[in-house]
Amino acid sequence: MEESFWKQTYEKILIGMGLFGITLKFLFLNQILPFIGARLLFTGFRKLRSENRWLKAGYAGAALEVVITIVTIVLGSVLEREKIYALYAWKGIDFCGGILPVVLMICLFLGMREELEQRDEKIKSEVLLHIIIWYAVVTVLAIQEYEGWILGFVIVAAYIGILVELKNIAEKLEEAGYVLEEHSVRISDSRCAAGAAILTAAGLFVGYTCFGAYHMEWTTANETQDPACEETKAHLLSLGFPDDILHDLKKEDILACKNARQVLLNQSDDSLRGRDGQLQLDGLAVELEQEGQWKVIHHFLWNGNPGFRGTEAVQINPAYQELNGGWTSQGKLTGQVLYDKDGTSYTADYKILQDENYDTGMNAFFYGSQQNASIFAEFSLPRSGENCRGYVAYEIKAKESDWWIDSWLNYTHQKTIWQYPVISAAQNRRQGGWLDERVFSTVQDALQVLPEGENEGSIGS
């Protein structure tokens, strides 16, 4: 026996609601299932929009759900989407997206009840009460950030139970003689689905290509002519400071090294290879004029093309980080990024340069989150240009003598555009580097020197 048009329609709506209630965070199902669910809800309520006011309201809500779902998926391709999430406008949109599935359930129930009443059929309102209680419980658990399995299964079972109750009402409506007539439409369901898919794909393309990396404020690098700065440069060169690295330093970092006592250098033999380029890492420790005070400098240089240019990150575990160690932090973090193009050098500050404490989810299932602290420098390289390079510097002061300056660096390079949702190289490090090899590549280096001048080669991997 051929299914009625009404049965095809309400089953489509119930399946759409079911897909919205499923959260599977693998194989992109967390995005695919809601997208399919929104499309089914829209096409289902579209056929009911002329029946009564409640079903017409459901059609409007389903259309809004499609838009919110598409926007949510597209935002996954935007690197700095957290800024959008922080806007009050988005919080309102997010709230609407969260409550709409429940609103659609209520609209379907009230719409079917109205049709039954027109046929002198009565139904109880327990389903409506069940929907409200279910949503209230889910809201409370979300506010409390509940992550347990037991209540999770109960919530899913209750959700399925509500859908079954709605299905029973739909069957009762059909038994009461309700017949849904199929009306002609100018745009078919398949074209609506194709349009939504194309719009989503176009949004993802724009997100990846235009907003998948940091927007850096590049300016022409001007060589300083300050006499004091030139005098300090000459003094540093006499102590063995590499000339190429010296020319990359900011004026404030050069002047901070006035009357420096000594320069200790580590040059790494380890490298991170790009498409046809190689990353060189160097570490320097400069003892400043005040005895026991040092400036630590980590410098990087891409010799050649690094390949894909998405996001980069320099993560430093500084010498002062060691618990009960011999060093304390002194002063602020400094640094910049540079590149050359057509004989001109350009420079920009890091998009983010900060010393931060953070939690990593690595092994969180078994051991819980882990507390970490690092210096992070986050940036993006220009789409064209050569000799891409930069440095991060910080100052330390000795608490005790005879302590090694032990400063570790992780340089992370994004090597492909193919990731979803988009995260930065620094976010990958904060999460324990779980996307290393597939999306990112990381190389490690260390500056390990003794203040007396005894030097041990850098350690990398």
Language-model segments: which ranges?
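N-terminal topogenic module of multi-pass integral membrane proteins
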Residues: M1-G44
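Short N-terminal edge-element motif at the start of the domain
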Residues: L237-L333
